[in-house]
């Protein structure tokens, strides 16, 4: 087991992500667009990516969620197998997925305080544990699965969708009732 504390712990997480051969499982409340794009690039290279995240915690994370959904839909519409399973949890179900868990190839697990954003990786003082012991990794994998299976996929707003239009109409109506 290794521990890292302070500014810059992102280098340890990024190194592990880049070394992935089979899969990466992620639980994080927020994911920046840059880090999201790196993960999506890994999926394009055949690395199976599973992400459990929250809906609308930050604007940037919301954009990352929309990009993920768009990639999945585009690949599905083109009958491509795209190894990205991206579960966005509605705040109505769980206000926030706050667990930060990163499992790489079932051989490394990282837990700690760092979200998947540049600020958390490079600017904030964060704490992570990097575990390689099979017993610890197995426990963390089982815990991740419990959390994953206890959550449902949320519908997310995509620009230009029917729901987006209905929300705009509701806002206009509310303005007239005041």
Model-derived regions, located:
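Short, surface-exposed acidic/glycine-rich loop or hinge patches that mediate macromolecular interfaces
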Residues: 7, 29-30, 134
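Primarily the HKD phosphodiesterase
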Residues: 15-81
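Residues that form or flank phosphate/diphosphate-binding pockets in enzymes
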Residues: 33-34, 96, 139
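Short solvent-exposed loop/turn micro-motifs enriched in small/polar/acidic residues
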Residues: 92-96, 122
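Signature of lipid phosphatidyltransferase scaffolds
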Residues: 108-178
């Amino acid at each position: 087991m290794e521990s890292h504390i302070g500014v810059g712990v992102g280098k340890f997480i990024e190194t592990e992500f880049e070394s992935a051969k089979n899969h990466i499982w992620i639980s994080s409340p927020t994911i920046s667009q840059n880090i999201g794009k790196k993960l999506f690039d890994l999926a394009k290279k055949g690395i199976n990516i599973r992400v459990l995240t929250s809906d609308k915690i930050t604007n940037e994370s919301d954009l990352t969620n929309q990009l993920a959904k768009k990639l999945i839909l585009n690949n599905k519409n083109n009958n491509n197998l795209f190894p990205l399973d991206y579960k966005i949890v509605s705040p109505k179900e769980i206000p926030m997925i706050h667990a930060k868990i990163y499992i790489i190839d079932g051989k490394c697990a990282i837990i700690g305080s760092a979200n998947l954003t540049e600020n958390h990786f490079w600017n904030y003082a964060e704490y992570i544990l990097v575990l390689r012991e099979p017993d610890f990794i197995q426990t963390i994998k089982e815990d991740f699965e419990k959390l994953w299976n206890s959550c449902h996929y949320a519908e997310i707003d995509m620009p230009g969708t029917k729901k987006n239009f209905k929300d705009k109409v509701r806002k206009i109506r509310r303005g007239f009732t005041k």
